[in-house]
Amino acid sequence: MRRRRGSDSAAYEARTRDIVVRVFPTYAAEESSPEQGLYLWSYTVEIENHGEETVTLIARRWTITDGFNRVNEVEGSGVVGEQPELKPREAFRYVSNCPLPTPSGAMRGSYQMVTDAGDLFDVAIPEFSLHLPGAAMKLN
């Protein structure tokens, strides 16, 4: 995993085989209600195929940990209602969100991919921090 700093959010990066996954989390203050225990995080994911074969993202698995170290596992088909196909040197980008009951947490996971030849493999999604600036960090 590699972490890069951007102008207003950090970028987290992981590479599995020839697939690069970058995540850019941001706090959605206007959609959050801290007084009701709702902290909404938006995250943009970029998936790049640097390989020589076409791959299709068929499933996702997330591990979400809140500030009290409670873990929630989420699995499903594709991402944002799609099973994107990435040809060599193509990329796919999507935006999703994650509500937390605490001002800090973390997410990590994996995508299941399949090649045109039918080979299945998992691609790591880098662990990334969901931490409201100024909030006490309870993870780690």
UniProtKB/Swiss-Prot annotation:
Transmembrane segments: none annotated. Residues 13-137 form the ApaG domain. GO terms for biological process: error-free translesion synthesis. SUPFAM superfamilies: ApaG-like. InterPro entries: ApaG_domain, ApaG_sf, Uncharacterised_ApaG. Pfam families: DUF525. NCBIfam families: PRK05461.1. PANTHER family: F-BOX ONLY PROTEIN 3 (PTHR14289), POLYMERASE DELTA-INTERACTING PROTEIN 2 (PTHR14289:SF16). HAMAP family: ApaG. This is Protein ApaG. The lineage of its organism: Bacteria, Pseudomonadati, Pseudomonadota, Alphaproteobacteria, Caulobacterales.
